[in-house]
Curated annotation (Swiss-Prot):
This is F-box protein At2g14500. InterPro entries: F-box_BR-signaling, F-box_dom, KIB1-4_b-propeller. It comes from Arabidopsis thaliana (Mouse-ear cress). Residues 6-52 form the F-box domain. Signal peptide: none annotated.
Amino acid sequence: METPNPLTLSELPHDLLRNIFNRLSFADFHRATWNSISKQTAPPKTKSPWLILFPDEGVHGCVLYNPDEDRIYKSVRDFSGTIFLANSGNWFLVMDSKSNLYIIDVFSENRIDLPPLESLLSDNFTFEQKGDKELKWQASNDQILVFRLPRAEELRGILWVDEKMKEFVAVWFLEDSCNFLAFYKKADDHYSHIQLEYVITDVFQSVSDIVLHGCFLYIGVGDYIQIIDLSKDQGFKDVTRNYLFNVHNGPWGFRSIFNLVVTTSGEVLMVLNNLYEKNIESEKSFRIFKKDPNPDPNKHDNLLVEVDSLGNEEVMLLDLGITMHGIEPNSIYFTRHDRVVHRLYIS
């Protein structure tokens, strides 16, 4: 009697396939997206953000931790010498051991190579690679020339990926003492320089915080917030005047630690971090402020009002500077000294 040939996955009844896909973990479901039935099945809902961990300081790559499953996933890729600069969902902006930038999907083999750093277009700045780990950054105008030799490890970045629209924006900058930023959009063959308020006079005034939300870039520099629209076909547009937001009009001291956060609706929040002054269990470990929607025209010091709740549907990812729907509503996720604190309620 002949043994019947086993059915392949694609030959199983559609109802059975849907039942199988509904039982898969998030990572297994993602690997099964080649099947047409999986695309008709809602992916597993996650209640908590995944964590990317770097054992041995990243020497042997990274692992992904899913709090919902209490499970660690090890990447099959070799990430030796790779520096992870930023992420947007499962897409990561990384720099390899030769200071090349690219974007990868950590759940697949998808990779997008970015132009070399030397492709920067700017009237005042140049960037040059000096060996595998050293860079040369130079700023100049008609009167002065300034240059630095930063290490590759000083490069920082932020990333925004819209998988539905198949669009992405990557921004990179130096960690310390530089008001310099550059960005790249899909299909460009170079990086474009983003001009901040000062070119040379305050060239060593560092960026205090930066958030990328869609094609809008929010930059905290000195005592103001600059807002850049990167959606243009060529270059960008400074729309700061449409969003006046002075950081000195809040109830914090000179040395206070604050973060910029942009909500799903595009509203800018200031988050005052009191964790270095108060116990982490304190109800006021964080204080959140927004621009007063009804300011007193006769006063100049009441432009910010405190926010008591993020709402029933939003959660704040403080490290990314954004809010999003779902997960654990009205909560803040953040990292502090490499220790992750989960579900800190603010109301």
